[in-house]
Amino acid sequence: MLNGLWLGFFVVAAISALAQWLAGGNAGIFAAMVESIFAMAKLSVEVMVLLFGTLTLWLGFLKIAEQAGIVEWLAKVLGPLFRRLMPEVPPGHPALGLITLNFAANGLGLDNAATPIGLKAMRALQELNPSPTTATNAQILFLVLNASSLTLLPVTIFMYRAQQGAMDPTLVFLPILLATSCSTLVGLLSVAIVQRLRLWDPVVLAYLVPGALLLGGFMALLASMSAAALASLSSILGNLTLFGLIMLFLLIGALKKVKVYETFVEGAKEGFDVAKNLLPYLVAMLCAVGVLRASGALEFGLDGIRHTVEWLGWDTRFVDALPTALVKPFSGSAARAMLIETMQTHGVDSFPALVAATVQGSTETTFYVLAVYFGAVGIQRTRHAVGCALLAELAGVLGAIGVCYWFFA
């Protein structure tokens, strides 16, 4: 599927560019597309360099966590749940503990920690893969849940709104939590249907129901706090958790007589191997996305949606927020730029800007996640991963629009 999708980006971009040249006389469109290709190739290297340092750091700390038995302990605690969701992964396998750490880091918005931990988890799952170039069911479930963007503290969205002068930067907090819950639930259900997982199993429910209650209680607590208190808590909790994880790994490692420095260096060496494998996949995906954006195809799609909504007689205010939704699966930086542009054009507290902020906080850069996570282990056949991830993305967008009409219309 990824092969056809990648080719499709170029074909759609070419058709769009030809239409603009032949019908509109815009001969400069081809120069813009070529420029975008080289710009994205440069960006791929820059992203890899940034990932290299982060990966080296966190793979070193994770090696200490493994030697100290932390990852093994997490795997045992969640073993009964993952035996039902990922039956091909043996009980107590290190991948299970790493997956747990990754979800925890994602939920707290700790992207710098989540990505390296996630890549380590994907490599651990790859050790169980009988066909190294084809994604396994466990790898697909892990990737789709990653791409569903479940975040409890969307600090960056608050920051963007504050920079643009919002009266209450955290106004979109609950809408984001509700919308991202939609995307995660749909992602899990879609994979469960395809892989025939039994989510109603008593053991699965024993984990999921208390987790949902804890999440609901946490959301209720945060919703009762003032904007200033919430922003302060977000910053303190994120940084404290990040540093706390590091100290936890080091102290438990020292207590277990692990040679923490030597172990850190040994684990950090793996960062280079992971990073160098990413570059071809990043170049391929980002260049295709860049061409699609530069061709104007996304703008054509937006105009078509606007006309369709008007023809149906529906409210069209949300359409002005769709640029963020349309580019988010392809590029986080482009979606961020679209969000800020929407805020500046319509006003930071306007309905389109509120929808765009909620979309930005409740969706993920699906194709980037796909390229990074599968690229790190050489997966070429993604099977149903793309379809399920995009379905979760769509659920997040529709959920964001619906929740914003509920809260703000």
Regions found by a protein language model. Give the residues of each.
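Signature of multi-pass transmembrane helix bundles
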Residues: 1-53, 159-292, 311, 384-409
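Short glycine/serine/threonine-biased micro-segments
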Residues: 11, 58, 67, 107, ...
